[in-house]
Amino acid sequence: MEDFPVLEMVCLGSSVALSGLFYYIYRKKRKTVDKLKEAPVMALDAKLIDLLNATPGKCLQYVVVEGTVQPVGEPLRSQFQESSVGVIQKLVLREHKLVWNSLGRIWTDSERVLLQRVNAVPFNLLGLNKSFVRVLCPLEATGPKMEIVHEKFHQATYGFTDLIGQYLSGEKPKGQLETEEMLKVGASLTVVGELILDTDRLLKIRPPTDGSEYFLSSADFETLLMEQEGQAEVWRVFACICALAGVAVLIWTGRRYYRQLKLRWEQENLRREFEGMGTGEREEDNGVENACVICLSNPRGCVLLDCGHVCCCFRCYQALPQPFCPICRQHIKRVVPLYQA
């Protein structure tokens, strides 16, 4: 029986590792979804302060608050559009280029971030009757998806010598993409986190102290919940696919192992049968005309099928490098003992 192949070990180990990783991510996402489903949606009004005053510790661990963005002081202004103001600003400069793939013999697209800067100012969520809640640590949250207020692509220019250098280096610059994103003043925002009543009598929402995920979303709560459920389902599908691939590799390997083991059993039984009948025949058949054509010492003791030639002893048959008849070179499908009267 052959050793366990390295390729099958790698495939099986990779499928087990990936399925375990994807299942861990799925369980983490599933836990987040379950916490979101349990989180109460709090109306942002004057009654919220009374509720927190009556709550032990003046804290609600995981709640949903919806409102409109309002800066505490001076808002951020767009560097490219004077009319655009917001509370979070993200400037990104990306380089786009073509890279020569020597394996596929093609040019492939590649990009990398040359510069990224995020600015933020304190802001509140404005609710009913001028009630508001201060949003703390917005850059630590997942989201929000901000509006792109500026996007411009700067095309690369180069001369003849640059072209030669590009083909020698295997990199061909395409240009740079400049983008600016902003969370604008007045935008609707959904925040999921820990709500507290601070010592200054201000409502504040912050990242949960129990490690739960902190969300800022431009969509409503129902859309946010559906997005998280969709992400959890994707990871579950990935985990199932990898697990099924591992099971398939295991079944295929086990089947091949069983076939090899069965063949070994058959060969062992056949060897014992030949040994049992060969002791008496060696004394009777010592003629040259009945000698094995390979070793020329043992008598011919097996019939090679399907060709039917009787030309060798069983030991020499087992020693054949490939199962081909020594006489006609036909493939040997099976071998049976030769019984002589």
From Swiss-Prot:
<keyword id="KW-0479">Metal-binding</keyword>
<dbReference type="GO" id="GO:0061630">
    <property type="term" value="F:ubiquitin protein ligase activity"/>
</dbReference>
<dbReference type="InterPro" id="IPR013083">
    <property type="entry name" value="Znf_RING/FYVE/PHD"/>
</dbReference>
<keyword id="KW-0496">Mitochondrion</keyword>
<keyword id="KW-0863">Zinc-finger</keyword>
<feature type="topological domain" description="Mitochondrial intermembrane">
    <location>
        <begin position="27"/>
        <end position="233"/>
    </location>
</feature>
<comment type="function">
    <text>E3 ubiquitin-protein ligase that plays a role in the control of mitochondrial morphology. Promotes mitochondrial fragmentation and influences mitochondrial localization. Inhibits cell growth. E3 ubiquitin ligases accept ubiquitin from an E2 ubiquitin-conjugating enzyme in the form of a thioester and then directly transfer the ubiquitin to targeted substrates.</text>
</comment>
<dbReference type="GO" id="GO:0005741">
    <property type="term" value="C:mitochondrial outer membrane"/>
</dbReference>
<keyword id="KW-0862">Zinc</keyword>
<keyword id="KW-0833">Ubl conjugation pathway</keyword>
<feature type="topological domain" description="Cytoplasmic">
    <location>
        <begin position="1"/>
        <end position="5"/>
    </location>
</feature>
<keyword id="KW-1133">Transmembrane helix</keyword>
<protein>
    <recommendedName>
        <fullName>Mitochondrial ubiquitin ligase activator of nfkb 1-A</fullName>
        <ecNumber>2.3.2.27</ecNumber>
    </recommendedName>
</protein>
<comment type="pathway">
    <text>Protein modification; protein ubiquitination.</text>
</comment>
<dbReference type="InterPro" id="IPR051652">
    <property type="entry name" value="MDM2_MDM4_MUL1"/>
</dbReference>
<feature type="transmembrane region" description="Helical">
    <location>
        <begin position="234"/>
        <end position="254"/>
    </location>
</feature>
<dbReference type="GO" id="GO:0004842">
    <property type="term" value="F:ubiquitin-protein transferase activity"/>
</dbReference>
<dbReference type="GO" id="GO:0051646">
    <property type="term" value="P:mitochondrion localization"/>
</dbReference>
<feature type="zinc finger region" description="RING-type">
    <location>
        <begin position="292"/>
        <end position="329"/>
    </location>
</feature>
<dbReference type="GO" id="GO:0005777">
    <property type="term" value="C:peroxisome"/>
</dbReference>
<dbReference type="Pfam" id="PF13920">
    <property type="entry name" value="zf-C3HC4_3"/>
</dbReference>
<feature type="transmembrane region" description="Helical">
    <location>
        <begin position="6"/>
        <end position="26"/>
    </location>
</feature>
<dbReference type="InterPro" id="IPR001841">
    <property type="entry name" value="Znf_RING"/>
</dbReference>
<feature type="topological domain" description="Cytoplasmic">
    <location>
        <begin position="255"/>
        <end position="341"/>
    </location>
</feature>
<dbReference type="GO" id="GO:0043123">
    <property type="term" value="P:positive regulation of canonical NF-kappaB signal transduction"/>
</dbReference>
<comment type="subunit">
    <text>Homooligomer.</text>
</comment>
<dbReference type="GO" id="GO:0008270">
    <property type="term" value="F:zinc ion binding"/>
</dbReference>
<dbReference type="GO" id="GO:0000266">
    <property type="term" value="P:mitochondrial fission"/>
</dbReference>
<keyword id="KW-1000">Mitochondrion outer membrane</keyword>
<keyword id="KW-0812">Transmembrane</keyword>
<keyword id="KW-0472">Membrane</keyword>
<dbReference type="GO" id="GO:0016567">
    <property type="term" value="P:protein ubiquitination"/>
</dbReference>
<dbReference type="Pfam" id="PF12483">
    <property type="entry name" value="GIDE"/>
</dbReference>
<dbReference type="InterPro" id="IPR022170">
    <property type="entry name" value="MUL1-like"/>
</dbReference>
<dbReference type="GO" id="GO:0042802">
    <property type="term" value="F:identical protein binding"/>
</dbReference>
<keyword id="KW-0808">Transferase</keyword>
